Curated annotation (Swiss-Prot):
The gene is fgf4-b. The lineage of its organism: Eukaryota, Metazoa, Chordata, Craniata, Vertebrata. One of its GO terms (molecular function) is growth factor activity. Its main location: secreted. PROSITE patterns: HBGF_FGF. This is Fibroblast growth factor 4B.
């Protein structure tokens, strides 16, 4: 019985090879046609829009459009996961909970938004460096994500450069203008 099941894929591949070989194109035309078909299929699947071709280049962000569900862990004090509460407060909690699950979505090359799934709020930073939860996406919700040498990430406000997301050793947020990326309280490990 298993021998018969193993023969089915071999027969299908053989049939496909014969069909391709019998096409009325020369070798170079066949390769060009297959290459164009593959490029079109690949670009359509990347764009996720049937029939629309998307230009792929080396400069394009490989994470553009990929949303990641993660918990951001800061190894300061006893270790905290950043959480977004329904009332808009943001702080750190030692144990994982439903408010610490974030959707990290790219909005530009190297720039992400952090969205609290349960609270339905974006992480945002105001001009004074204070973190808050925003119901609506705006410029204060954009953060530059930087991979650090220790494999942690730092999140710098896009609107207010030099201000970073940070948690203190007690789990409370620190003002973004009082910290730097060299401080461990700005280092976050995205965890599944």
């Amino acid at each position: 019985m298993t021998v018969q099941l193993a023969l089915v894929p071999i027969l299908l591949l053989g049939t496909a090879a014969v069909m391709v070989h019998c096409m009325p194109f020369s070798s170079s035309q066949r390769n060009d046609t297959l290459e164009r078909r593959w490029e079109t299929l690949f670009s359509r699947s990347m764009a996720r829009i049937p029939g629309e071709k998307k230009d792929m280049s080396r400069e394009s962000d490989y994470l553009l459009g990929i949303k990641r569900l993660r918990r951001l862990y800061c190894n300061v004090g006893i270790g905290f996961h950043i959480q977004v509460l329904p009332d808009g407060r943001i702080n750190g909690m030692h144990n994982e909970n439903r408010y610490s699950l974030l959707e990290i979505s790219p909005v530009e090359v190297g720039v992400v938004s952090l969205y609290g799934i349960k609270s339905a709020m974006f992480v945002a930073m105001n001009a004074k460096g204070k973190l808050y939860g925003s119901r609506y996406f705006n410029e204060e919700c954009k953060f530059k994500e930087t991979l650090l040498p220790n494999n942690y990430n730092a999140y710098e406000s896009r609107k207010y450069p030099g201000m970073y997301i940070a948690l203190g050793k007690n789990g409370r947020t620190k003002k973004g203008n009082r910290v730097s990326p060299t401080m461990t309280l700005t280092h976050f490990l995205p965890r599944i």
